């Protein structure tokens, strides 16, 4: 798996530079990103990118479309394997509701369905596993959806440049003290609870998922502002949970105030916590680099525990019974 992660910057560059056919849809007022696991994270990232537009964005992890979709809705169906049953169900529903539809996968049943019913389809290669293929699919979609995205090409290229710089520090050939991902992996213990601010939920959720799949660890996520209204009370009892504070470079001023208060509370209660800070830059750069750094930390975490990060036997158990 680490061989693919070492090439994420190259995969990202090549995927974005590839001559993908871009969408030509117009009059879109609602975009629904559908997908499970890593495909769902792609939707989360696009939701952040589109958050300052007038387009309503939904991210669906499951079988059902919102009842509000219509002919002005674009349904972006992503299944890296092409065989995700939930996403296939939504693809069929979207076609029947006369929505604008595009499907993206490495092949599988999704490709067969799109050929049979003449649905817009783009085929993207899978690298190793769906979760390791995130970068290729993300940057391919940035190209495919380009006409409707507010992000500039220079910002996309900036994110790839920063990804390359980060790779030089965290790749598998660097096991020294300046490897941010390896350092974090050594600190991960107990049950990680990842606190995140508005705008970085995609990175936090992806980190949780990667800890579960790669490191085989339970983990949780909480919005830092919301936890001040409920979750923080849980720390009044001893716990094996380990807080990790995922902070943005330019968090809202009131959110920064919450971070300060929570750290003060943890220090007063002698609760150890770790801090992770995003890079400066546009939202894509922040999210992609955080996801890369945190994903790699889960692979190192697995290696430290002498666990193979690749197999996902529990998920195989479920799929065999569907």
Language model features with spans:
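A generic structural motif
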Residues: 59-62, 217-228, 272-281
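Conserved, well-structured ligand/cofactor-binding cores
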Residues: 2-25, 66, 157, 274, ...
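A short, charged, Gly/Pro-tolerant segment at domain boundaries
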Residues: 311-322
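Short helix-capping/linker segments at secondary-structure and domain boundaries
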Residues: 17-18, 54, 144-154, 215-217, ...
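C-terminal active-site/capping subdomain that shapes the small-molecule cofactor and substrate pocket
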Residues: 233-313
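Active-site phosphate/pyrophosphate-binding segments
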Residues: 2-4, 10, 19-23, 27-30, ...
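Glycine-rich phosphate-binding loops that contact phosphosugars or nucleotide phosphates
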Residues: 26-168, 186, 248-274
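Conserved active-site and cofactor/substrate-binding residues in soluble primary-metabolism enzymes
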Residues: 3, 7, 41, 45, ...
